Amino acid sequence: EIIGGTESKPHSRPYMAHLKIITKQGTFAYCGGFLISREFVMTAAHCKGRHITVTLGAHDVVKKESTWQKIDVVKQFVHPNYNSYTIRHDVMLLKLKEKANLTLTVGTLPLLPQSNFIPPGRMCRAVGWGKTSVKESHSNVLQEVKLRLLDPPACQHFPDFNHNLQLCMGTVFKGDSGPLLCARVAQGIASYAHKNAMPPSVFTRISYYRPWINKVLKEN
């Protein structure tokens, strides 16, 4: 992400979480995520690592502000069927060490009931700190881009695409795992795209995972 996007209005997306990850190899990686309750952040399973620190209330991730809340992750709940080869079931919940303080710049993003299935043609927005062009590195400031939900055949050239589990969108680029918003509700999580950032791209379909999400939240 976020190719062809524009900078978000600072703090207009108070649910956004910036993830700093120490990988199993000991290197740093970065992802986006979003706060779904005071204690939990949702992101992609491909963002898992040895240790994760979440920053809430951020716009430019290199310019510290008084709005920031930095909280360590105490537990990573990777979907039990996540497959790093097919990139199916690319969803993870992060339990925070302490509850986030809800403020004007830190808030939660509602998840819809499970029955919600959005039709192709709908315009949505992807939000995150991803790449702004193929040649650029990640963006320091939060970006967003409008994307159209495509008919499933547009993603059939991805061998592991499954319409029930995933959404086929116009393109975003890698490095993100932020939310896909349709009518201000989280419908997807950025999962993968072509290496050259040509459309389309694949998002995890949140509605399919509601039973698992509800179970994790209830038990923890």
UniProtKB/Swiss-Prot annotation:
GO terms for molecular function: serine-type endopeptidase activity. It is an enzyme of class 3 (hydrolase). Its main location: secreted. PANTHER family: CHYMASE 2, MAST CELL-RELATED (PTHR24271:SF23), KALLIKREIN-RELATED (PTHR24271). Its EC number is 3.4.21.39. Glycans are attached at N101. It comes from the Eukaryota. Major secreted protease of mast cells with suspected roles in vasoactive peptide generation, extracellular matrix degradation, and regulation of gland secretion. Keywords: Disulfide bond, Glycoprotein, Hydrolase, Protease, Secreted, Serine protease. The active site is at H46, D90, S177. InterPro entries: Peptidase_S1_PA, Peptidase_S1_PA_chymotrypsin, Peptidase_S1A, Trypsin_dom, TRYPSIN_HIS. It comes from Oryctolagus cuniculus (Rabbit). The keyword Protease applies. Disulfide bonds join C31-C47, C124-C182, C155-C168. This is Chymase. It is found in: Secreted; Cytoplasmic granule. One of its GO terms (biological process) is proteolysis. Belongs to the peptidase S1 family. Granzyme subfamily. It catalyses: Preferential cleavage: Phe-|-Xaa > Tyr-|-Xaa > Trp-|-Xaa > Leu-|-Xaa. One of its GO terms (cellular component) is cytoplasm.
